[in-house]
Amino acid sequence: MDHFSSEGGATDSPIGSARFTTTHWSVILEAARPEAPGGVDAFARLYRDYWYPLYAYLRRRGYSHHEAEDLNQSFFVSLLERDRLRDLERGGGRFRSFLLKALQNFLANEWDRATAAKRGRGQAIVPLDDVDAESRFLADPTQAAPETGFEREWAFAVIEHAMRALAAELRAAGKERLYDHLRPHLQGDRNGRPYAAIAADLGMSEGAVKVGVHRLRQRYGELLRAEVARTVGSEAEIAEELRRLIAIVSA
């Protein structure tokens, strides 16, 4: 599936400069400060959204399902420890690259299979469906190297987060049914239902459906760009990271 349609897709987003008031970097730094209101909750949301790429990376490194789960939890918990965040104040960089490098260092310097379970269990940041995660991993037909697989899973996680944000907006506006019908066309699915059939189901004209798809593609592009903006350190890096994501999911 092509997640980036050439018609009003992510690269054609009308958003100009993105706001950097709440990046993933700032979420980690705030979560490390006990006095920061909502910091830990924000970090939990970040973990929920981006834990799977790291889980899949660990599985590709040869760790078992339970080892990968425990190591993943423990790694994120370690990011909340103040003494591990001293070097995070920086002016640029991709959060994707930081997380992977930090996990690699975590595995090399502090953890082995024998100690994984001792600290990982019982420190769940948020409840996760680990059975679903393992099923998802086993269903992936690709035999990518761990680092390549991580970048691929990260790209799809960013895309899915933007799509969920769009769904939430439409649900709040009472347009969830419209979203359900138009979603395949937002992601460039060539096997999506014809506009005429969608129009008949929704009681709209075919022209109105086309306008709806165009507008939702624009909004999807905005939300995707905003999500990418939260994972980089400067506005100059947004376009480059978007291009990188497009290349990854198109490979």
Give the location of each predicted region.
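Intrinsic, short, N-terminal disordered tails of RNA polymerase sigma-factor systems
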Residues: 1-251
